[in-house]
């Protein structure tokens, strides 16, 4: 992902020793603890319809560098998440030596996965060399990085949340009226209620109804996708820019969301619905008051105009395709024999939309932390906060 101020990388295979992330650019003197990161990792592991892997992994992050006595140093922050399942995969995922006769190559690519495309690109006859890195297990490292960025944003009053809008063909009917996009209190309430739901639905009383639907789909050997919503509150106007294509904040957010495994669509504000409305029904009228300053009477555009944040809540809906590993595999071809046969199988989830919403929070936090630091600069928190205060005063006086 292209960032302008922050830099981060992740490394690690799904069944390797663990996942590593390095984040550079966070200012010095930000209070940070491992527990704050681990809280986000626990949220990612929740959700009805998850696979057996979640019973094995209890993700915790270890801070290896960049923090001393509970505060960031301004140097790169290195994080490590150990894979507990590694103990069961030492032979299959050995770093050195030759594979033993018991290690069977994965040669039947799964439709919808990176298996075949990646095998061709990197000339790998054992497709496990592709699927291990392509796995959504990698998102645990991104959630850890996002937790640091969330903590940074919280120092400026910026809050990020999410909830599930639909799973498969089953929608949360109450979320079809999108007038709440302009209501920070309603958005935050939905997020808080989703925290009490196994499916991250902002109406936990609907959990059993949705779980029954998931169980019925599972019995058919199918998997499910869905739509989740992620939002940010108290984001100041002026992040991003209209000046060049790659500086537009909505483009940066969309790219970040599309980089999440299995994501196939992103809407900001009304998204595709805006294309079916008249202009007068889409564009958010502007108001001003002594206490609030400039505001919009609605938030159909999801908090951005011209590639720049406008001070309204940032609201993003993200579409996740069904998980491609199926109990009843689809047709494929063995890359060694070229014979048509059923695709290979791996342990997998039935639905992972609730977990993906937490990953979406992390990616939004990374993009906004990067954009805020791009706007303000600064090497230590006290300096950044002073610049933020000056900018807020500028906004109020404009």
Curated annotation (Swiss-Prot):
Annotated organism of origin: Aquifex aeolicus (strain VF5)
InterPro entries: Chorismate_synth (IPR000453), Chorismate_synth_AroC_sf (IPR035904), Chorismate_synthase_CS (IPR020541)
Enzyme class of the recorded protein, top EC level: lyase
Gene Ontology biological process: amino acid biosynthetic process; aromatic amino acid family biosynthetic process; chorismate biosynthetic process
Function: This reaction introduces a second double bond into the aromatic ring system.
Enzyme Commission designation: 4.2.3.5
Keywords, ordered alphabetically: Amino-acid biosynthesis, Aromatic amino acid biosynthesis, FAD, Flavoprotein, FMN, Lyase, NADP
Transmembrane spans: none
Protein name (database record): Chorismate synthase
Cofactor detail note: Reduced FMN (FMNH(2)).
Pathway: Metabolic intermediate biosynthesis; chorismate biosynthesis; chorismate from D-erythrose 4-phosphate and phosphoenolpyruvate: step 7/7
Catalyzed chemical reaction(s): 5-O-(1-carboxyvinyl)-3-phosphoshikimate = chorismate + phosphate
Residue numbers binding NADP(+): 44, 50
Gene Ontology cellular-component terms listed: cytosol
Self-association state and partner proteins as the record states: Homotetramer.
Coiled coil spans: none
Necessary cofactors: FMNH2
Family recorded in the similarity comment: Belongs to the chorismate synthase family.
Gene Ontology MF, one: chorismate synthase activity
Binding residues for FMN: 133-135, 261-262, 306, 321-325, 347
Pfam families, sorted: Chorismate_synt
Domain of life: Bacteria
């Amino acid at each position: 992902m292209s960032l302008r101020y922050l830099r981060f990388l992740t490394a690690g295979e799904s069944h390797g020793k663990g996942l590593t992330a390095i984040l550079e650019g966070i200012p010095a003197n930000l209070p940070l603890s491992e527990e704050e990161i681990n809280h986000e990792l626990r949220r990612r592991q929740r959700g009805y319809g998850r696979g057996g892997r979640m019973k094995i992994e209890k993700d915790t992050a270890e801070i290896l560098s960049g923090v001393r006595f509970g505060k960031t140093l301004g140097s790169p922050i290195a994080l490590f998440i150990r894979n507990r399942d590694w103990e069961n995969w030492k032979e299959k995922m050995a770093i050195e030596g030759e594979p033993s006769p018991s290690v069977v190559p994965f040669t039947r690519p799964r439709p919808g996965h990176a298996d075949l495309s990646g095998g061709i690109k990197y000339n790998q006859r054992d497709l496990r060399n592709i699927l291990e890195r392509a796995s959504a297990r990698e998102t645990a490292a991104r959630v850890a990085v996002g937790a640091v960025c969330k903590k940074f944003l919280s120092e400026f009053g910026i809050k990020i949340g999410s909830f599930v809008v639909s799973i498969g063909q089953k929608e949360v009917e109450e979320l079809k009226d999108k007038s709440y996009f302009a209501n920070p209190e309603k958005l935050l309430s939905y997020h808080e209620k989703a925290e009490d739901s196994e499916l991250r639905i902002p109406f936990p009383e609907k959990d059993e109804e949705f779980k029954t639907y998931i169980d019925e789909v599972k019995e058919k050997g199918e998997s499910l996708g869905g739509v989740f919503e992620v939002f940010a509150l108290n984001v100041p106007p002026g992040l991003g820019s209209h000046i060049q294509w790659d500086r537009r904040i909505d483009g940066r957010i969309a790219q970040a969301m599309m980089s999440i495994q299995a994501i196939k669509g992103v809407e900001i504000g009304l998204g595709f619905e805006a294309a079916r409305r008249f202009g007068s029904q889409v564009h958010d009228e502007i108001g001003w008051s002594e206490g609030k300053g400039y505001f919009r009477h609605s938030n159909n555009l999801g908090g951005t105009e011209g590639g720049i944040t406008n001070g309204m809540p940032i609201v993003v809906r993200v579409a996740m395709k069904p998980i491609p590993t199926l109990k009843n595999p689809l047709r494929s071809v063995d890359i060694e024999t070229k014979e048509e046969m059923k695709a290979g199988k791996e342990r997998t989830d039935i639905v992972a939309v609730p977990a993906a919403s937490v990953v979406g929070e992390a990616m939004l936090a990374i993009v906004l932390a990067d954009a805020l630091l791009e706007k303000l600069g600064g090497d230590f928190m006290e300096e950044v906060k002073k610049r933020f205060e000056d900018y807020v005063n500028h906004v109020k006086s404009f």
